[in-house]
Design a protein with these regions (language model features):
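Aromatic-lined carbohydrate-recognition surfaces of secreted/lumenal glycan-active proteins
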Residues: 146, 171-210, 253-263, 337-345
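Hydrophobic beta-strand segments within extracellular beta-sandwich modules
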Residues: 458-459
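Substrate-binding cleft and catalytic face of glycoside hydrolase catalytic domains
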Residues: 39, 45-66, 74-199
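Short, flexible loop/turn segments at beta-strand junctions in immunoglobulin-like
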Residues: 448-452
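Substrate-binding cleft of secreted/luminal carbohydrate-active enzymes
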Residues: 259-265, 270-397
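Substrate-binding cleft/loops of secretory-pathway carbohydrate-active enzymes
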Residues: 196-226, 236, 240-241, 265-274, ...
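Aromatic- and acid-rich polysaccharide-binding/catalytic face
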Residues: 50-52, 100-102, 139-142, 148, ...
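Pro/Thr/Ser/Gly-rich low-complexity, intrinsically disordered linker/stalk tracts
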Residues: 396-418, 453, 467-468
Length: 468
């Protein structure tokens, strides 16, 4: 008999607070043409969101001598990755919502952030409006994010203290207002977010952070803020979200479209395998990047190493932040993060085709490995054993969100993982079933009464047909 069960004593007062599981998604960064190639994997993973970004200046603006001088209209209207992004949305249907972030690195230009009303700014808006109309992009996205890590992309110096904060604030306000006008004119329904701020707890002197936050807090056309967490320490996610909520007073929705601990991993890419290496058939002096190259070759040859071996290597190091995905997810829940999109897979090839001592280990932050552990029976990438168990637990949620036990009653609040078509079964310590009832699909809680103090009860959620 299939069941989700737990054991408790009702004479104890139990109180376990929980929140609804947050919606997880897949982030593809600039590779917006790639989700269409992973449709079946996306369906199998049951993600709720897909996110990508478009670099407006690099792709769609004309640049001469550090000035924006025009719009590449034909490049926008014939941009194949845009078409494939929309094709992926249509293939996945209404259950999966899409997020588009607009990356606008003003550092490319000598005047950095243009003034409101200038030709340079109008070209940015013109390119964006054409993009949103191309292939009906605007009708197929749920969220549009203005900006992508502007702390780095607006900076005039290395300490990030002088980054045209006031001009950027004016730009975002004007951008949000223009987007709202286009929405009203065209019947578009996407929500407007500002962002994406990154590593805010590390940037107390940044002009950009308070500029973006002020737009979120004060512009009624902006629904919320996008936060990126690329952390050096595992507690940084908590620090970043707390600062945004408490210091900056943001009460609107939060989303997180990128998160990783790659900065904690990168310094160790050339670490030796050491004792673990000799125990597993490698040399102690082999470096991590050499191991990664070797197992990629093995996987390509159809003889991948096991997930157990791979996981055991990284968990043998004291510096590896075990269960960091779970830790981050708990922070996302605590701060009621609306949408969360982490790295899903990594596009094979490119700059990371062969690792060396300077390669950044982004791939270790993906839910699936595109080249390390081979393919499963269905031809899909095998999952990353360092993260996948925590991803599944976070995605599915808990059957029980919270419990409160009294002397004669038990209050159960059902979590996101509960099957509301199931049967609640309560048996006493003698195996006698004292409660059997269907769950109320309209309510997230159940009250069980008339229990006997000092008695242990077994509480189970069964499938409605008691099928195995």
């Amino acid at each position: 008999m299939k069941m989700k069960a737990f054991l408790m004593f009702v004479l104890l007062f139990l109180c376990s607070m929980g929140t609804k599981a947050q919606d997880l998604g897949a982030n593809y960064n600039e590779n917006i043409d790639y989700p269409i190639t992973e449709i079946e994997m996306l369906k199998q993973s049951k993600v709720s969101w897909v996110r990508g970004f478009v670099n407006i200046p690099n792709l769609f603006l004309q640049n001469e001598n550090g000035k924006i001088v025009g719009v590449k209209e034909n490049a926008i209207r014939t941009h194949i990755p845009t078409l494939k992004f929309i094709q992926a949305k249509k293939a996945l249907g209404d259950r999966v919502k899409f997020i588009l972030s607009l990356k606008i690195p003003f550092e490319l230009y000598t005047d950095t952030v243009p003034k409101v009303g200038t030709k340079e700014m109008e070209y940015i808006f013109q390119a964006t409006e054409i993009l949103l109309k191309t292939y009906d992009m605007a009708k197929n996205i749920e969220i549009l994010v203005m900006g992508n890590e502007p702390e780095w992309e607006n900076a005039l110096d290395t300490d990030l203290c002088h980054a045209d904060g006031e001009d950027y604030r004016a730009f975002l306000n004007e951008f949000a207002n223009r987007l709202t006008t286009w929405k009203q004119t065209n019947g578009w329904t996407f929500d407007i977010y500002a962002g994406a701020l990154n590593r805010v707890s590390e940037l107390p002197k940044s002009e950009t952070v308070p500029a973006v936050v002020s737009v979120v807090n004060n512009n009624p056309n902006v629904v919320g803020l996008d936060l990126h967490v690329h952390a050096l320490k595992i507690n940084q996610a908590e620090d970043d979200f707390r600062i945004i909520r408490d210091k900056y007073g943001v009460t609107k929705k939060l989303i997180c479209t990128e998160f990783s601990m790659v900065r904690a991993l990168n310094p160790h890419v050339a670490d030796a395998l050491g004792e673990w290496g000799t125990k597993h058939g490698y040399t102690a002096g082999m470096k991590i990047y050499e191991y990664l190259n070797l197992i990629a070759e093995k996987a390509n040859a159809g003889t991948p190493v096991s997930a157990t071996e791979f996981k055991s290597l990284f968990e043998s190091y004291s510096w590896y932040p075990k269960n960091w995905y779970k830790t981050f997810y708990e922070v996302f829940k605590k701060y009621d993060t609306y949408a969360i999109t982490g790295r899903f897979s990594v596009v094979p090839g490119g700059a990371r085709a062969v690792y060396d001592a300077n390669t950044e280990m982004w791939e270790l932050g993906g839910i699936y490995f595109s080249r390390y552990l081979g393919l499963d029976a269905d031809g899909f990438y095998n999952p990353n054993p360092l993260l996948y168990p925590d991803f599944i637990a976070a995605r599915d949620g808990l059957a029980v969100s919270s419990l409160v036990g009294g002397q004669r009653e038990l209050f159960i609040r059902w979590g996101n993982g509960a099957d509301k078509t199931g049967i609640l079964s309560v048996t006493d310590e003698n195996g006698t079933e004292v409660v059997r009832r269907s769950l109320d699909s309209e309510n997230d809680y159940t009250l069980v009464e008339n229990l006997v103090p000092g008695t242990a009860y077994h509480v189970a959620l069964l499938k409605s047909d008691d099928a195995v």
